[in-house]
Amino acid sequence: MSHPALTQLRALRYFKEIPALEPQLLDWLLLEDSMTKRFEQQGKTVSVTMIREGFVEQNEIPEELPLLPKESRYWLREILLCADGEPWLAGRTVVPVSTLSGPELALQKLGKTPLGRYLFTSSTLTRDFIEIGRDAGLWGRRSRLRLSGKPLLLTELFLPASPLY
C-alpha cells in the first residue's frame, strides 16, 4: 500500500547547500524541534494516519541507503501527519535493524503516536544534518538522527495544506 504523497516524498531532490529562502520558510524547514509540537502550536489536534510499517530490505530504500549503515533489514514507517484531520506532512522513517535494541525497540511500537513525541523526549537524541529538498512546488527535508548514537533517517514532505506555504 502506498500513497501519492509518499511517492512525491521519494521524488524530492536535495540542495547541496541550504538555499537562500524566505526566513519564514527556513524557520519551518530547519526546525530542530518536533514538527508535531510545531503543528500543535498552531492550535491543531495532531494525528497519524499509518500508510505502511514493517521490515524492508535494501532494495526498498534506495534513496536512504547511502546515508545509513548497510544492513540486511530496516524498519520502515510511512505516515501522514494530520492537523485536525487534514494531512499537513508525509513522513518516512528508515531505521537500521541494529538501531532497534534497548530503549529504541520502542520505534517499532509507535503505532499512531507521532514519531516526534518519542524522539524529542529522549535525552540521547542528536541530529547529524538537515537537508532541504523540493519537488513539483512542494518542500521537504531529510535528517539523520541518532538515539544513543544509533542512526535513523527521517524524511518529511510538507503537503499543500501545511502552514509552511
Curated annotation (Swiss-Prot):
Top-tier EC class: lyase
Main localization (coarse): cytoplasm
Pfam families per UniProt: Chor_lyase
Domain of life: Bacteria
Pathway where it operates: Cofactor biosynthesis; ubiquinone biosynthesis
GO biological process: pyruvate biosynthetic process; ubiquinone biosynthetic process
Chain sites annotated for binding substrate: 35, 77, 115, 156
Single GO MF descriptor: chorismate lyase activity
Cellular component per GO, a single term: cytosol
Reactions catalysed, as given in the entry: chorismate = 4-hydroxybenzoate + pyruvate
Disulphide bridges: none
Keyword Cytoplasm belongs to the record: yes
Role noted for this protein: Removes the pyruvyl group from chorismate, with concomitant aromatization of the ring, to provide 4-hydroxybenzoate (4HB) for the ubiquinone pathway.
Record-linked HAMAP family: UbiC
Similarity comment: Belongs to the UbiC family.
Name of the protein: Chorismate pyruvate-lyase
